[in-house]
Amino acid sequence: MTAEDAAAAMSSDSAAGGAASAKAPEGVAGAPNEAALLALLARTGYRMVQENGQRKYGGPPPGWEGPHPQRGCEVFVGKIPRDVYEDELVPVFEAVGRIYELRLMMDFDGKNRGYAFVTYCHKGEAKRAVRELNNHEIRPGRLLGVCCSVDNCRLFIGGIPKMKKREEILEEIAKVTEGVLDVIVYASAADKMKNRGFAFVEYESHRAAAMARRKLMPGRIQLWGHQIAVDWAEPEIDVDEDVMETVKILYVRNLMIETTEDTIKKSFGQFNPGCVERVKKIRDYAFVHFASREDAVLAMNSLNGTELEGSCLEVTLAKPVDKEQYSRYQKAAKGGGAAEAAAPQPGYVYSCDPYTLAYYGYPYNALIGPNRDYFVKAGSIRGRGRGAAGSRAPGPRGSYLGGYSAGRGIYSRYHEGKGKQQEKGYELVPNLEISAVNPVAIKPGTVAIPAIGAQYSMFQAAPAPKMIEDGKIHTMEHMISPIAVQPDPASAAAAAAAAAAAVIPAVSTPPPFQGRPITPVYTVAPNVQRIPAAGLYGAGYVPFAAPATATLATLQKNAAAAAVYGGYAGYIPQAFPAATIQVPIHDVYPTY
């Protein structure tokens, strides 16, 4: 080969390489494994494009006709080595079903972010992928984590005026966002004519919900002149169909507060006497246990949408939570799984329905709102995720008011022997509800102090202070206040008789502070004349110069020990059983 032929060959190879690079789609051209990716696309006929920090393979696949696959067809793939790409992932995941779309999250340096989403054409293929490919060894010693993806299409919107109806909320949300399918609004437990100040908005896709969330972030848009709070709603728990076919417990919501468990049992047991085993009502919702699933389904179909005591009922099958998932939630709430599980206790324990509580507002609720440990375990106020529109990996997700399931009955602490019975606490202030920042809450209760006597039958404590130092001061202030109360007339005669028999006479007028008998009060500076002031000292005042009077000497329990200390020790405070003496203010002395 001559030099001219070699140059021509090199020129031809360069041109071919340039043409190949020109045909490579964006995101593939210049990739470390460009040749392998191009070979994959040539073999499968799929297309590939990179946008918004993710590289999409397929979506839809070649020859696809019809709508997007239904919800539940997507799986989350985690623990991907950062130098593994579609040429290695696609052969693994297409072995269990036809791939509709694979989205690999990418970094700016060309490596992946360690996770991806794979959407199959059918729901059964996604379930098979979870069963067979979880812990699949993609490389020696490197295992993939595969689980169902939470394709969340629902937003939580708080700060809505309570007088707005569902139709008004739907119309207003549709004006500022696109892809709105439905709005779920709950009536107030106390007043069915009002809503609870929040709503759930269902969108046609996760992307539409993510774009709406970005647009409605606090500070950007106001609804009806009100600031709103927006976040992802807690996704509905996807329970296996085989498990749901065995459920014989109904979840009933939108009950009146006054409705009793007996009324519910009578209403749901009308179709087959004795079919209802038990009813557990919590505020405005209840769980109804049936002896058989057939009776439960019959009652659900017959009573859903009917009225009970003036309220329209919503009846669905209760959703049990997977035991492993519940255990993970418990460990996360206690600090990342480091704490040991509580000892099983007998009996049923129901989780409180979070949407029955008041809405505290954004962002205060993220710090001290009700059911805080529901959303603190994974972070409360979350920003944008690493991927486009945020990650949809499973696990405890942060949300306002502890997260909602939009009316779906979930008895996560419903299983027998799963919960820990709550102990009765002590009442600081009657009828005071305290929102605790930590999981240890102060519950209402009553404690009697018999030693205080009938004169002071009730002590009203101050509201719990925020700071420890304030608490030290408040304790003394609010213990002194009840002591300053005058004696009640019923015990006046007994007090007068006791005072007459006392060693030291009582004062004739009620003192400003009176309480349990105390010993005489002495001056604190010896040999210094006090400034005379009329009425400054009470009748029980004993001067420092003459402590060992005959009257006081009779009260000494140890005269020998008292003599060592100059006659000031050894007095018996109990020797003043009924004396009511005045506590003098501080002695006033001239300055030096």
Curated annotation (Swiss-Prot):
Principal location: nucleus
Annotated InterPro entries: HnRNP_R/Q_splicing_fac, Nucleotide-bd_a/b_plait_sf, RBD_domain_sf, RBM47_RRM2, RBM47_RRM3, RRM_dom
Keywords: Cytoplasm, Methylation, mRNA processing, mRNA splicing, Nucleus, Repeat, RNA-binding
Keyword Repeat: yes
Extent of Low complexity compositional bias: 1-24
SMART domains: RRM
Subcellular location field: Nucleus; Cytoplasm
Domain of life: Eukaryota
Sites of Omega-N-methylarginine modification: 397, 408
Membrane spanning stretches: none
Pfam families: RRM_1
MF annotations from Gene Ontology: mRNA binding
UniProt note: domains: The RRM domains are required for mRNA stabilization.
Function text: Single-stranded RNA-binding protein that functions in a variety of RNA processes, including alternative splicing, RNA stabilization, and RNA editing. Functions as an enzyme-substrate adapter for the cytidine deaminase APOBEC1. With APOBEC1 forms an mRNA editing complex involved into cytidine to uridine editing of a variety of mRNA molecules. Through the binding of their 3'UTR, also stabilizes a variety of mRNAs and regulates the expression of genes such as the interferon alpha/beta receptor and interleukin-10. Also involved in the alternative splicing of several genes including TJP1.
Assembly information from the UniProt record: Homodimer. Interacts with A1CF. Interacts with APOBEC1; form an mRNA editing complex. Interacts with RBPMS.
Name this polypeptide is given: RNA-binding protein 47
Organism of origin: Canis lupus familiaris (Dog)
The encoding gene: RBM47
